[in-house]
């Protein structure tokens, strides 16, 4: 699925996930609560059809959101 379905904030969080940051570290970096990050991650998983963090990273690479 194309990543246009992700909001700007969801894309920011996906990039941070690919950098290996924990939800708390993402929250601290973006000045939002961990619970908000949890919700965004759940939304990202649902929108992309991914099942876990590893598949999110693969999705991000395949869709040009991050480069290796």
Where do the PLM segments sit?
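Helix-turn-helix DNA-binding segment
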Residues: 1-34
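Residues within the DNA-recognition helix of helix-turn-helix
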Residues: 9, 40-43
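Helix-turn-helix DNA-binding elements, focusing on the entry/boundary residues of the two helices
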Residues: 23, 41, 53
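Short, contiguous strand/loop micro-motifs
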Residues: 28, 43-44
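Basic, Lys/Arg-enriched C-terminal extension of HTH/homeodomain DNA-binding domains
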Residues: 45-68
């Amino acid at each position: 699925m194309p990543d246009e379905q992700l909001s700007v904030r969801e894309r920011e969080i996906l990039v941070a996930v690919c950098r290996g940051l924990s939800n708390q570290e993402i929250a601290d970096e973006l000045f939002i609560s961990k619970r908000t990050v949890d919700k965004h991650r759940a939304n990202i998983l649902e929108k992309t059809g991914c099942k876990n963090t590893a598949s999110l990273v693969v999705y991000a690479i395949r869709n040009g959101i991050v480069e290796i």
